[in-house]
Amino acid sequence: MEVEASYSYGFLPSGRHQPYAPPPPHPAEEGELWEYFPCPFCYIEVEVPFICNHLQEEHCFDTRNAVCPLCADNIGRDMGAHFRVQHSHLLKRRKPSRPSSSWPTPSNNSDPYFEGPPQYMMNNRTYQDPAPDPLLSQFICSMAQTDTNSDNTNTEIAVSAVSHDQRLSQRVTLTDDASKLELKERLQRIEFVKEIIMSTIL
């Protein structure tokens, strides 16, 4: 019962998560095309034979009372066949990627953990600092010039801020007297309203 409850909230037991698609059931033959179907929930391309497993394990999709998430038809027993027939326009056929054992290993890299497909490998060059981009250097140089200009303007702003603060302090003293008078009037009004309310209650 606990397992069903955890599935209804989208949580999977720790051993059930599969970050990658399971390995193919047989090695790829020359010219063979595999069918991939985009998952209707997360749009990851999954091989058609494994779409049921993906939907059950990753999205808690109930295949016993299965209704297709795309067309709302009853799927029946074979979900893969339903996707092939009813949603063939979404199928993608492509050659499987080569297994990692067939990747050529670089001669200077002795660690097999960092082996990868050739299109993602670096060109055996050491990293060099890139030359500055002329377009970006215009902005960088202009920033240095604006820094010197901003120092001059900062001093002018500081002087004007001091004089502005002096003016504000004078205004505050004038407004303090007015606010004390206003406060006294408001307190008198509050007392008057209290007396009226008390007289109506009694």
UniProtKB/Swiss-Prot annotation:
Pfam families xrefs: Di19_C (PF14571), zf-Di19 (PF05605)
Annotated region described as Disordered, given as residue ranges: 88-120
Bias kind Low complexity: ranges: 98-112
Start-end of Basic residues biased regions: 88-97
Database matches in InterPro entries: DI19, Di19_C, Di19_Zn-bd
Coiled-coil annotated residue ranges, if any: none
Family per similarity comment: Belongs to the Di19 family.
Designated name of the protein: Protein DEHYDRATION-INDUCED 19 homolog 5
Gene label: DI19-5
